[in-house]
């Protein structure tokens, strides 16, 4: 997938970001390099390879000692949302900024 300069300008416009021609060209180059890297990674055959939580597991003889995934704080969402101008179903409501 390769982007064109018009794509970068359109994305910048939608995000309400002002970019110069030079910045747009530099961003285009960086994005296309990134997409090229992603395509290379997707081309690798990974069938039969077990996913890792972290690559350090491959070089350390001992697995990482991770803490239990447990709630350690009380749910204070209602307290935090009392001062919000608008909430709904536990979510903060904000004005629409992108059409």
UniProtKB/Swiss-Prot annotation:
Keywords linked to the UniProt accession: ATP-binding, Ligase, Nucleotide-binding, Protein biosynthesis
GO MF term set: asparaginyl-tRNA synthase (glutamine-hydrolyzing) activity; ATP binding; glutaminyl-tRNA synthase (glutamine-hydrolyzing) activity
Protein name: Aspartyl/glutamyl-tRNA(Asn/Gln) amidotransferase subunit C
Protein family (similarity comment): Belongs to the GatC family.
Enzyme Commission identifier(s): 6.3.5.-
Gene3D superfamilies in UniProt: Glu-tRNAGln amidotransferase C subunit, N-terminal domain (1.10.20.60)
InterPro entries the record matches: Asp/Glu-ADT_sf_sub_c, GatC
Pfam families, per database record: GatC
Catalytic activity: L-glutamyl-tRNA(Gln) + L-glutamine + ATP + H2O = L-glutaminyl-tRNA(Gln) + L-glutamate + ADP + phosphate + H(+); L-aspartyl-tRNA(Asn) + L-glutamine + ATP + H2O = L-asparaginyl-tRNA(Asn) + L-glutamate + ADP + phosphate + 2 H(+)
Described function: Allows the formation of correctly charged Asn-tRNA(Asn) or Gln-tRNA(Gln) through the transamidation of misacylated Asp-tRNA(Asn) or Glu-tRNA(Gln) in organisms which lack either or both of asparaginyl-tRNA or glutaminyl-tRNA synthetases. The reaction takes place in the presence of glutamine and ATP through an activated phospho-Asp-tRNA(Asn) or phospho-Glu-tRNA(Gln).
Subunit structure comment from the entry: Heterotrimer of A, B and C subunits.
HAMAP family xref list: GatC
Underlying gene: gatC
GO BP, one annotated term: translation
